[in-house]
């Protein structure tokens, strides 16, 4: 299958003056990247947009699972939704009620938090632009706080088990997703 994509060079100077903080060079670069990618997505002609960070590895069928599940869940909820492809271990730190839905080939559960890798509609990005703008103009702890607030208005779902693994510090709460052979997935993607 052909999936269309575009790549654009990051222009930090174009965005850095808009930020409400100046004391963290790494986050300035990060936030400028986030802002540019969101602005880029707004001007492109795509119905669905997948924002993905560079430290994720996906299963072979991840995109198919997300697109088909998106269609199914948005039909069931009669509204746009957001899909996060990773089943983060930190999501199991809290005891909270959730909804479980059957996606294309995976079960998905409603989550109230995610990091910055997710699939959403262009309509959602436009309608809730203020949440994204708030996220990249500021340096919250956690950084994704505006996303977490958004998920109180828009359903966000995460697959069980993951269809993408965040290869970060495995000893952190953002570490490797449960119930998946991360070494095998790594080897398959070499």
Where are these regions (language model features)?
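The conserved acidic donor/metal-binding loop of glycosyltransferases
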Residues: 54-57
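Conserved catalytic core of nucleotide-sugar-dependent glycosyltransferases
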Residues: 48, 59-131
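Conserved glycosyltransferase catalytic-site signature
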Residues: 30-35, 63, 112-117, 137-148
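Acidic carboxylate-rich catalytic motifs and surrounding loops in phosphoryl-/glycosyl-chemistry enzymes
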Residues: 1-2, 86-89, 157-164
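Active-site-proximal specificity loops/subdomain of glycosyltransferases
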Residues: 1-46
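Structural alpha-beta junctions
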Residues: 12-22, 75-79, 149-157
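C-terminal catalytic/acceptor-binding lobe
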Residues: 122-123, 127-190
């Amino acid at each position: 299958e052909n999936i269309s994509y575009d790549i654009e060079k990051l222009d930090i100077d174009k965005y850095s003056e808009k930020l409400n903080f100046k004391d963290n060079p790494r986050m300035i670069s990060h936030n400028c990247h986030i802002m540019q990618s969101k602005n880029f997505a707004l001007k492109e002609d795509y119905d669905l947009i997948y924002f993905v960070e560079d430290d994720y590895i996906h299963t072979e069928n991840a995109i198919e699972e997300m697109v088909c599940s998106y269609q199914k869940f948005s039909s069931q909820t009669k509204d746009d939704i957001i899909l996060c492809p990773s089943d983060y271990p930190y999501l199991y730190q809290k005891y909270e009620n959730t909804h479980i839905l059957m996606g294309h080939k995976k079960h998905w559960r409603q989550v109230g938090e995610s990091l910055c890798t997710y699939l959403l509609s262009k309509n959602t990005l436009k309608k809730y632009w203020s949440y994204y703008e708030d996220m990249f103009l500021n340096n919250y702890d956690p950084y994704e706080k505006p996303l977490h607030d958004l998920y109180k208005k828009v359903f966000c779902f995460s697959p069980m088990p993951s269809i993408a693994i965040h290869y970060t510090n495995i000893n952190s709460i953002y570490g490797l997703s449960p119930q998946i052979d991360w070494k095998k997935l790594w080897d398959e993607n070499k």
